[in-house]
Amino acid sequence: MSVKIRLKRMGSKKNPFYRIVVADSRSPRDGRFIAQVGTYNPLTEPAQVKLEEEDILGWLNNGAQPSDTVKNILSKAGIMKKYHEAKFTK
């Protein structure tokens, strides 16, 4: 089972709001997910992001692969840097 950290689209038409979820890569974009680890609202200025850092680091350490967009969000929040430091300083 390949696990991804990706965006799940919520909100109404032309008013997107995203949940950052951990899901099996075979499940649909807005379908079944394993865990919710954050939210992302691109319409606010600046974009509003809420992340559960410990949960995300745990999933990354267990082999979950972030999507490109989620990887950018995590990089801006500094989580990817912490993950790489922990991974390569063992």
Swiss-Prot record:
The keyword Ribonucleoprotein applies. GO terms for molecular function: structural constituent of ribosome. One of its GO terms (biological process) is translation. It comes from the Bacteria. Pfam families: Ribosomal_S16 (PF00886). One of its GO terms (cellular component) is small ribosomal subunit. Belongs to the bacterial ribosomal protein bS16 family. PANTHER family: 30S RIBOSOMAL PROTEIN S16, SMALL RIBOSOMAL SUBUNIT PROTEIN BS16M. HAMAP family: Ribosomal_bS16. This is Small ribosomal subunit protein bS16.
